[in-house]
Every structure is written in C-alpha cells, then in structure tokens.
Amino acid sequence: MSESLSVLLTNDDGIDAVGIQALYQAFDDIAEVTVVAPTDDQSAVGRQLSSDVTIHEHDWGYGIDGTPADCVVAGVEALCPDVDLVIAGCNKGANIGAYVLGRSGTVSAAVESTFFDVPAMAVSMYIPGGGDTPWHKQATEVSAFADASRAATYLARHAFDAGVFEQADYLNINAPVAANEPATLEVTRPSRVYDMTAEHDGNGTVTLHDRVWERMRTDDIPDPSGTDRRAVVDGHISVSPLAAPHTTEHHEALDALASTYLDSI
C-alpha cells in the first residue's frame, strides 16, 4: 500500500509550522503528499467550518484561509480527491485526554476526514514546558519531531494491510520530543481525567484554567496505565484507535420516556 499511498497533509498550527514540515519531509519519501493547510494558526478551533475559503498555491500544495476542517473538505472534495489517508499534524503540543479531542483543530481535521470514509491520523507532540526555556522556543527544529514522524510513517505503511482502519476510523498519535533513543509505542485509550477550574474575580471576569498540563510536568496525575496521558508522561508514543463521535446505543430508559411523551401533553 505504501508505494502508491496518496496523502492529504494538514494541520492547525499553519502551513509554515515546523511540525507540518517534519511530516511532509518524512512522508515525501513514501507517499504522494499534497498539503492543504491553514495559512495561519488555527489552534483549538475544533471542527469550525467556513462557507467560502481563499486558496493560495504553495510549493507543497495549497494554503487555505480557513480552518483545519475547511482544509479537509476542500482537499478531499476539490483539490486532491481520491486520497487514501488524511494526516493532521504534527501539532506542537499534545492532544490527549477525552475532553481535549473535540477542541483540537488537529484531531478535528482527522474526524472530518472520517465522514468522507477516508481513514485519518492526528499526530501531535508533547512538550512539557516549564524550565528556563519558554515553551514557544522549544522544538523549533524538524529533528525534534523524529519520534512523531517515525510513528506516523510506520503506521501509514502498515496499518492498511494489518486491518487497523477496518476497526478504527482514525488514530490519535502523541509522541514525546525526540531523545537519543527512539520511544516505544503503546496502544492507549483517551484519559477521562478532567481538571478545569474557574475563578470569578467579582469585577466581571471569570478566569478559566486547565490544571492538567501543570500537573503533567510534575507527574502529579492519577491517569492509569493504558491511557494516552500516562503513556506520554512516561515517555512513550501513545496511539489511540478511535471512532468518529456521536455514536449511539439502544437506551431503554429513554425509550420509556419517549413512549409516554404524548400522554404528558
């Protein structure tokens, strides 16, 4: 499959970000790659969609004045149809935990792809932050994304023949910053740990704070083995096989309420 693999590559950090450059260089050796990515930073926009977007020619494909979801729709339907795989990333910053997935532009691009029945991978890299070097000055070179690139290309080459996408709609991959030795790969599930807080200052402002990230830096997390966050904090590559959202199951209690609705009016 890898010899004829056709890939649409997008992200939410913008087409000039180092993370998408790292994946483009890695996949250019094994696939036919077309980049369709936002022209500017679209982090945390979720699946926000536009009605019209302006496209710009780029050496790697196209820049889009829009969101990651816009890029997938425009790419799959108009700019590079018949792709085998959509890859979003590599995001500079992890996308882990069940509550994060719907916010992430990176993951949302992968989700958008699944509604076209095109398998996808969302690829992100965990940067602990803290310390003497500001977060935005970390992982500024392609080499920092080596683990993420290795994992993504490995899975792209082998997942189809292994039947992975017969059971999963998309893969959410989170890797550490590359070290001297390659990181190991673990199959995980999204963590359910949630630690958002809000403080009202009494003067018209409520400050929202996600405490999970600072707790991760000190390993002060209750996430059990087998979760994406635990794997990443322990220095492993996390791969979560996921289905597109909004699935449903038979619900007897709701059936009972529905059956008596008209009687209540």
UniProtKB/Swiss-Prot annotation:
Annotated positions binding a divalent metal cation: 12-13, 43, 91
State the UniProt keywords alphabetically.
Cytoplasm, Hydrolase, Metal-binding, Nucleotide-binding
The answer to whether the entry has keyword Cytoplasm is yes
Q: Say yes or no: keyword Nucleotide-binding present.
A: yes
Cofactor(s) listed in the protein's UniProt record: a divalent metal cation
Q: Name one GO cellular component term.
A: cytoplasm
Q: Which reaction does it catalyse?
A: a ribonucleoside 5'-phosphate + H2O = a ribonucleoside + phosphate
**Source organism superkingdom:** Archaea
- What GO terms are given for molecular function? 5'-nucleotidase activity; metal ion binding; nucleotide binding
> What is its subcellular localisation?
Cytoplasm
Protein EC: 3.1.3.5
- Cofactor binding summary note: Binds 1 divalent metal cation per subunit.
Report the protein's function: Nucleotidase that shows phosphatase activity on nucleoside 5'-monophosphates.
* HAMAP family tied to this protein: SurE
Identify its protein family: Belongs to the SurE nucleotidase family.
Stated name of the protein: 5'-nucleotidase SurE
Q: Which organism is it from?
A: Haloquadratum walsbyi (strain DSM 16790 / HBSQ001)
Q: What is the lineage of its organism?
A: Archaea, Methanobacteriati, Methanobacteriota, Stenosarchaea group, Halobacteria
